[in-house]
Regions:
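Conserved active-site tyrosine of GNAT-family acetyltransferases
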Residues: 22-27, 112, 139, 174-179, ...
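Post-signal peptide N-terminal segment of secreted/secretory-pathway proteins
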Residues: 52, 81-86, 90-92, 103
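Eukaryotic phosphotyrosine signaling hubs
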Residues: 93-97, 161-162, 253-256
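Repeat-solenoid scaffold signature
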Residues: 165-174
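Phosphate-binding active sites in nucleotide-utilizing proteins
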Residues: 184-186
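Flexible internal linker/loop segments at domain or repeat junctions
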Residues: 204-205, 212-213, 223-250
């Protein structure tokens, strides 16, 4: 195999201070009730992002069979997790919200808002997609986006991960990266507007450049499960954004990574290097 293939978003990592409470919450509200794996071992490969030494962690990957990527729920086992010292605001640098699949935004909002108050009324994304925002029990923000596709119908209103909302400093360079390297080459919208009609997340009423990117139909063994996904890039125009993970480790509370399902990682590594984005960590260098 000389070419690489990206089949979709396999999972998005969520660092937490309490593994079991987070997972139970994701099961109860988002239906992430199928365990793919769970272990409590040492993370040895991410040394540039874990203080230069291996770190013990308890993690699992859980999915919702309605379709979409999974949750990688991740907690340090022997190190006290370092929470973000400031309240994360719209446009801060890194993943500040995860996109979650929802077959009926209005119906799910009605259901969930009866028991969970940290959510906004439905609105629309700049590309016209119905959505609403919801914080989990530790303040991680999820953007519920309407997507009526179903992998296995379990009569749930939610599915899995279908993208991320990412704060950036240089929109044009970021669009080029996600388009050329990760295949998000379809620009669904490129606009300047406020982020939300509501203020679940600080600075939602400020002006931002927002670009929503989609990919052509993905192929691969699990592409049908993962489904379509989008990347929403957000650049602050009226404030200086902060780095969400400055002074902290990978695995600390928050959204820690987007994991793509890749065939032929060596070919992808070569391609990334040619594009000026060499791997910073390679779990299988040989």
């Amino acid at each position: 195999m000389s070419e690489f293939n990206i089949a979709g978003i396999q999972q998005i990592g969520v660092g937490t201070i309490d593994f079991r409470k987070s997972w139970n919450w994701f099961i109860g509200y988002f239906g992430a009730d199928i365990k793919i794996l769970e272990d409590d071992t040492v993370a040895e490969r991410m040394l540039p992002y874990t203080g230069g030494k291996p770190q013990q962690r308890h993690a699992c990957i859980a999915v919702n069979l309605q379709g979409g990527g999974g949750f990688e729920i991740w907690q340090y086992s022997k190190r006290k997790p370092s929470v973000c010292p400031f309240k994360i605001a719209v446009g801060d640098l890194g993943i500040f919200a995860a996109k979650l699949k929802c077959s009926d935004v209005a119906a799910f909002y009605k259901k969930v808002s009866a028991t969970w108050k940290s959510c906004t009324p439905p609105e629309k994304l700049p590309d016209g997609t119905p959505c609403f925002y919801m914080n989990d029990l530790y303040g991680n923000c999820f953007q519920l986006v309407e997507d009526k596709s179903i992998f296995i119908n379990e009569d749930k209103l939610t599915g899995g991960m279908v993208g991320a909302v990412i704060g950036v400093t240089d929109m044009d360079r970021s669009v080029k990266f996600y388009s050329e390297v990760l295949g998000y080459s379809v620009i669904k919208c490129d606009t300047v507007c406020r982020f939300s009609e509501h203020n679940l997340m600080p600075e939602s009423d400020k002006q931002y450049r927002r670009v929503i990117l989609a990919a052509q139909k993905r192929k691969g063994a699990f592409a049908e499960l993962f489904g379509d996904s989008t990347i929403e890039l957000v650049q602050a125009l009226e404030r200086k954004p902060r780095k969400i993970y400055e002074g902290r480790y990978w695995g600390d509370p928050g959204f820690i990574q987007i994991c793509f399902d890749v065939s032929n990682m060596k070919a992808l590594g070569k391609f990334c290097a040619q594009k000026g984005h060499p791997f910073t960590v390679d779990s299988c260098p040989d």
